């Protein structure tokens, strides 16, 4: 009927033309039935002829009127009405206007006007009256714009839809009334905001949303929505009507739906529909267009209805049920819509209820109708959309780019020849299918064959050539280009999926072209290549991208490696390999641990030898498979990768794996080949080239902020792009970087010129999210940042390449800016190290941060990763470490060191940064240059130059042996394998130059750090001379160990800081000596002595090797230089810690203070042996670290000694386990370049800080809270590291990050190494107590534990190296060795198992916010082992680390472990006392710590410890930093700290607020859990606060594992307490909190074996029957509550602090309760027996959570000793372990019995 058709037509039409009313349309279509009918109705009284004429007039008039006026529509009717019935026009108007064509219905009866009479008129009048009644506006909008008619269009569950009219445009609209929602104020506000946002959405495929308001209907409130009126129904009704949808229609409509979704997802912020289904997809009949509707309903329905009611189960993605979802839920729903369209069958129609659907959806079972899809292409697309794992789903962009949805251009492009996947050139054929669609004239049968080079050609260029050749008209060029692109893109994707075959040639060509240019900066260059290749890579399926992202997430370190692997396969072997190499050492570890297990079968040999190597081998294998030309690549890229492999295998070979190393590289034949080629040719040449090419860039990057440089971004920055944290203020440089064809926009907000080299950028993502992140120009690799961005879906995989390019450009610009800035700064500040460092700290928090960054590099102080942005690049830091593994990074770091010591330090931290620093140093110093070159050449030079170095140095033989072994391993060991190699070579060169003065120093350089140190010495001849006595010795010893790349990054950072502090350098050097010893061990797999520290999380063999190394090193070092050197070489982690400390120390006078703190810590640990001797040195450094470089250095050295001693006792096993579990994060960041430096395994360690935080705290997803929390953690961890060498290795990474974040970086660089170390120690303390470092604290959270460990090791090493303390240290080393041996047996196996489990668990728990803590636990174990001798250092470090990583359970557990180990290793309360003293020292002031430590800290330590605890507890906010370092720190440092504190306070506050909220909820949940736990476990301890029990429970499980790990090292030495602490990172925060978190962090990591070991150890060592059951019970309970408790615990624990996640809770607790946790550690150490690790954590588990005010009660630790270690921060009575303890009352009670008087 005319009316029927007319009605829809009118509505449809009204929708189409915007302001044209129904009437308006009618006149235009005067011939239509609708118009005629209407006219008939209106003109029934007129005669036929007259009617016609009248009609025309009226129509025209009405048209005009309608447009202008509401009256227009009624005009025809009005005329008619006037003639027929004198009905007032006003009355008619509404009806006409509203009713439009519906009048036709009423007028139908009058078929001819001639027949119509007055009677008809009357009838008509009556009908019209009825119509009017219907069409009268029954309601109007508050604004009066919209009218509602009483015409119901539809009714749903929650809404009724009426017809309405927009009086402004005369377009009919839909008036939707939603039933009463009973919305809360917050919900109402949210809906208002969403409505305002929806009003602005205008898109052809989105139903227009006009307005909304609240109204009262029938006495009830309702929400009214006015939307566009869709006339042809929904997709659902269409399917019901037509059953089968034609493929063409399906393609067209699906494409329109995708365009609409893309529009929504690209808004800022992104709009997620959440209820997409066929019922909400509307069709506009006339045009066949499709629009997505019901946008505002998802939120409204969500608010007031049960979750099961919200959304449509059939279309709801699995994550929707958990309410943790993103845009991918709409992709899932789209897939289900497409499935329904393809099958006309409702998805999951086989299920009877929503519960069945839920079970199927969450278990990944596809709907039954999925198998009914006939079109394979459609089926593939649907499958890609409805994958259970959201990260594997295709993205909207991928779908739109899919050939199936490509719009028909009338052209067809096909392959003329089969694609062999090997040739980059494709033979394509193009012909015209539909000439009508083209504007030009074409012959239908004419086909154009042409070649297309995937590498160089672009579709636009080819199309343009065709136009020029006359094949097509110019107007068709876009269509031609689109057709070519649509055909080439899938080919690229398939090749990316099969990189072995497809990309071989491409890679070869790239290797030749890019590899030659970038082999030197392989790190950086390759990342560039990957970025470029990302173009192709980005086109790979979303699934592939997501898999890669997941891998990256799992292992931040692996980030790079996994990316590199993918990139390699997708883009070019060279680029992939490069990124791999740069990140491989660290990646190798993390990757090997996380991915290694996956690829174990693939590379068993490599894995056995070195987890890192495994990965690299695998990668290499992949590369080889991918490219036969990989051999060429292997030369360029393999040097890096191989160095990784070599470094890893070499690390083992040094002691046991020498041959293994060789064979390891051979894991894959290509690898072996690469080794020889790369070694001699690629590395030497590439390294030199890198040095030459990278030096300028490196210098620039070191000196330039990551402003907006494009040039330098390419190679120097990429590898080290992760280093810096966002904390540093960045100079705003508006540098919008919309990438070509990318949907993201990158803008530079500011570049920091205060020495941290931080650049703050804002990224507008493809889905219109605004992501603000900061990164270190030198320390963060753009690839790493890109990986993280891709992983978080901020950047599409397809955009990654462009993103990296833009980042590189930014980095280059920033480097230029910084280069200029630092050139002047160096001129004024390098010489005046002290002054510069002060100003740096005070004036430029950024500089401090820079230092931190450099420290971070080696330490993987990716705690930055923890800043919620991740954008900060917590993850990036990990990645950066990976990248730093590559030689270019090393070179960069080296070169940068001389020129820009203040800045390089932080940069050094990141491997890349280190490389740049080194490069700078090389530029400035010939020796450095040589070093750098040798580093680049790594293998050749390592062999030749390392020997030289060894000969030059006193400990030449040992070093030579180690170095030679390390030569192979060294490059790999270093975060960048090339880097490490370069370092080694550089060391020899430097050795020659500085042999007399700093021969040791040069040896330090063999690793990255060694080179840095040498550079620093070179840069500061005077300083180096001062320290030459001790420094040289230390360096010599360090050099070999340093050869272990593990410490090179830290060393580089140190070198940078060393510029002003040779002493620090020496310190670093001595640990470095250990590193070479550990070089084999550096590799996560290799647990050589050198790697012992770094390997301690990696593998038990490492411990054994470490022991052997310790012995051999001891002998060699004694013969060569000092007995202490062997210890330091044994524990590269100590070196790393020292380095970490150095960087911060050199920051300023305060930095100097930091160094004393570190020394104090070391002294405390070594107090038994060297505490008297160190005391003066320590004091000196404390009082004037900068001025007394030489004096300070000895102190530092002695500290190192102690650390080494401690390491010796515990590291073998603890280190091994820690490394094993942490993927080498705990032990040697450099030793485990992949694990430590890279993000994966190290991710646990430093990833804890970066990735750890990121992953650990899913709740930290809030970028702000996460970032601030991470910063706080980082700050505290930093202080911890500074105060305790104990955490030296972790400290290096974290401290570097911390320093950079703390604005210590700038000054530390110029400062002497010692000064840097002091600063670092001070920073550590600050991080512990200073709120300024809170932000950093965040960043450093997990890494802190590592840092703390490294610091303790480093301190011990320093002590060992201290000339005055040689004998004492030697004895201590022996003790440590014995202890280590004791610990080693038990720890080794548990740790090894722990390492992988821990890594995996950590990865998982990181996501849960507790994985990191587990890592921390691992680290803690490691630290504990080291801390046996360095008890004072350990406690302080532990506290600080706990403080710093309060949130990071890692730190907590590590601290506990360390404390325990101190007790066991020290085997005397003095260890405890030392721990206390160290704590007090770090908490109060370096000076205080120094003296106490020097005094052996047995007597003073308790007091000092308590004081330190208090200061630490209070100092998490920053009081601690001021307390610890105020005395020694310069005013500049104070100012800087204050500035940093204030800088991040707001973020912290926000984060705390959010976290508090979450914690509150968790608290309640945990409370109930705790109550149940308390009931189940009866303990003498007072019940812990509710959240404590839960986290305690969840952590209990972790704790047993941690205990197991620690047990291995602590079982014999009664390090149960330490283990407890280690296991309870939260406990570290606040004793109770630390304890609680520890278990959580360890929970994921611990295996049943570990639990058994812990139980057995408890039986043997403690002899406490209760403990054993406790562990089992705890294990079980933790297992039960693991999933929920983990997050809950983490969240509960931080509830007081307001942190969102476990990490956060740990952090917050650490802030207030770090002292508590440390006291726990103290008490634990004091109790020789292994008190139940669980027990003690219970005690502190939540006591300190509330804040620093809670005294640590050791009830949990020792039921008898319910003493409250009075941590000033914990002003309260005893630690109330009740909350925590209740979780495991038995264990904790028993443990307390075991260790009644633990804390003092």
Swiss-Prot record:
Q: Where is the composition biased (Basic residues)?
A: 1587-1598
Written domain comment of the UniProt record:
Disordered regions undergo liquid-liquid phase separation (LLPS) for the formation of a cytoplasmic membraneless compartment that concentrates WNK1 with its substrates, OXSR1/OSR1 and STK39/SPAK.
Q: Where is the active site?
A: 294
Q: Where is there biased composition of kind Polar residues?
A: 707-723, 834-867, 880-894, 1442-1453, 1467-1476
The top EC class, named as a word, is transferase
**Residue span of region Disordered:** 1-25, 707-739, 834-868, 880-912, 1060-1086, 1431-1453, 1465-1496, 1571-1600
What is the organism field in this record? Answer: Homo sapiens (Human)
Keyword hit for Phosphoprotein? yes
Q: Identify the stretch annotated as signal peptide in this record.
A: none
Q: Which keywords fit this entry according to its UniProt record? A: ATP-binding, Cytoplasm, Disease variant, Intellectual disability, Kinase, Nucleotide-binding, Phosphoprotein, Serine/threonine-protein kinase, Transferase, Ubl conjugation
Q: Briefly describe activity regulation.
A: Activated in response to hyperosmotic stress: cell shrinkage promotes formation of a membraneless compartment that concentrates WNK3 with its substrates, OXSR1/OSR1 and STK39/SPAK. Activation requires autophosphorylation of Ser-308 and, to a lower extent, Ser-304. Autophosphorylation and subsequent activation is inhibited by increases in intracellular ionic strength: Cl(-) potently inhibits WNK3 kinase activity via direct binding. Also inhibited by K(+) ions. Kinase activity is inhibited by WNK4.
**Binding of ATP: at which residues?**
227-230, 277
Its cellular-component GO annotations read: adherens junction; bicellular tight junction; cytoplasm
Q: What is the effect of changing residue 294 to A?
A: Catalytically inactive form. Inhibits sodium-coupled chloride cotransporters and activates potassium-coupled chloride cotransporters
**Name of this protein:** Serine/threonine-protein kinase WNK3
GO molecular function annotations of the record: ATP binding; molecular condensate scaffold activity; protein kinase activity; protein serine kinase activity; protein serine/threonine kinase activity; transmembrane transporter binding; transporter activator activity
Checking Pfam families in the record gives: CCTL2_WNK (PF24889), OSR1_C (PF12202), Pkinase (PF00069)
Residue positions where Phosphothreonine is found in the record: 541
Q: Which residues carry this modification: Phosphoserine?
A: 62, 304, 308, 1070, 1585, 1638
Q: Where are the transmembrane segments?
A: none
Tissue distribution of the protein = Expressed in brain, lung, kidney, liver and pancreas, and in fetal tissues including placenta, fetal brain, lung and kidney. Very low levels of expression were also detected in fetal heart, thymus, liver and spleen. Isoform 1 is brain-specific. Isoform 3 is kidney-specific.
Q: Which InterPro entries match?
A: CCTL2_WNK, Kinase-like_dom_sf, Kinase_OSR1/WNK_CCT, Prot_kinase_dom, Ser/Thr_kinase_AS, WNK_Ser-Thr_kinase
- State any GO BP term from the record: positive regulation of sodium ion transmembrane transporter activity
Which consequence is recorded for altering residue 204 to R?
In PRS; uncertain significance; results in decreased SLC12A5/KCC2 phosphorylation
Subcellular compartments: Cytoplasm
